[in-house]
Amino acid sequence: EASCAGVRIDMIVRGICCVRAGVPGRTENLHIRSLVGRYLEHGRIYSFYDGVNTRIYIASGDFLTRNTECRVEVGVRVEDPVLKEKLDSILRLQLSDNVNAREMQPDGSYQKVKPAPGEPLVNSQMGMYDLLRDDWTARDKAPAPASVAETPKPQPVKAPEKPAAPAKIGRASC
């Protein structure tokens, strides 16, 4: 519906994708990319822009039916501006990949994304590696925040006298 209303939709789908992108009159505004490279990653980052505001969410699952109907998954809106910017930069990096990216065609096949003449090569997986390495290096060099440094060590807890009865757990049909 959003595609038919003229909304541009960019999706990064690592595996199975049941919707066809670029079908005239249906999904011509839907662009689906697959990133397959050295690392098996899928961020489960969801970004929505209404022309004024960007809302970013992270989730434990994707939108496969088994995840939305048969599992307990969680999604949360990211409010912290620093985290929002970091997640947005990850999405922009992945959407600009022209080394590992394949784009879905209207027939369901995928075509390798090629850089335009003179455009630099963008490998989002190596970019993510560099970003995380730099982040961890900076974290290692920074002094621990006072709240972390002063956190008391956990004390051993005595076991209960009588063990609790085991809970009865049913089986899901999924």
Where are these predicted regions, by residue range?
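PLD/PLD-like phosphodiesterase catalytic module centered on the HKD motif
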Residues: E1-S173
